[in-house]
Amino acid sequence: MARIAGVNIPDHKHAVISLTYVFGIGKTTAKQICAATGVAESTKISALDDAKMDEIRAEVAKHTVEGDLRREISMNIKRLMDLGCYRGLRHRRSLPVRGQRSKTNARTRKGPRKPIKK
């Protein structure tokens, strides 16, 4: 298994699919990386030599991926919570942030029902 950005990439899959195992790289970005490095999308990772793998690693390094991306996302949420804006309050209360109804639905975000104590 090859390692890119600290993630084990499966050898037996196509290059585009294998690159999506890295957090922050979807199918579109994987296609762009393959085009920039000159690797055919249908090429298996096991068929690539070390020079091509180094090119792919260099191209992936240009993007924000894995731990840096996770940290950036959590810092953005923390910033909203510190500002005290509406979105930050919704994050703080573990409620839906993007305007969904929460009277009857939103069980995933709110968690299991809590009984009313008498």
UniProtKB/Swiss-Prot annotation:
- SUPFAM superfamilies annotated for this entry? S13-like H2TH domain (SSF46946)
Extract the InterPro entries matched here.
Answer: Rbsml_uS13_C, Ribosomal_uS13, Ribosomal_uS13-like_H2TH, Ribosomal_uS13_bac-type, Ribosomal_uS13_CS
> Which GO BP terms sit in this record?
translation
Q: What function is annotated for this protein?
A: Located at the top of the head of the 30S subunit, it contacts several helices of the 16S rRNA. In the 70S ribosome it contacts the 23S rRNA (bridge B1a) and protein L5 of the 50S subunit (bridge B1b), connecting the 2 subunits; these bridges are implicated in subunit movement. Contacts the tRNAs in the A and P-sites.
**GO MF annotation, one:** structural constituent of ribosome
Q: Region entry Disordered: which residue ranges?
A: 93-118
Q: Does the keyword RNA-binding apply?
A: yes
Assembly, in brief, is: Part of the 30S ribosomal subunit. Forms a loose heterodimer with protein S19. Forms two bridges to the 50S subunit in the 70S ribosome.
HAMAP family, per database record? Ribosomal_uS13 (MF_01315)
| UniProt superkingdom | Bacteria
Q: Name one GO cellular component term.
A: small ribosomal subunit
Q: Residue span of the signal peptide, if any?
A: none
Question: Pfam families of this UniProt entry?
Answer: Ribosomal_S13
Q: What is this protein called?
A: Small ribosomal subunit protein uS13
Its keywords, alphabetically, are: Ribonucleoprotein, Ribosomal protein, RNA-binding, rRNA-binding, tRNA-binding
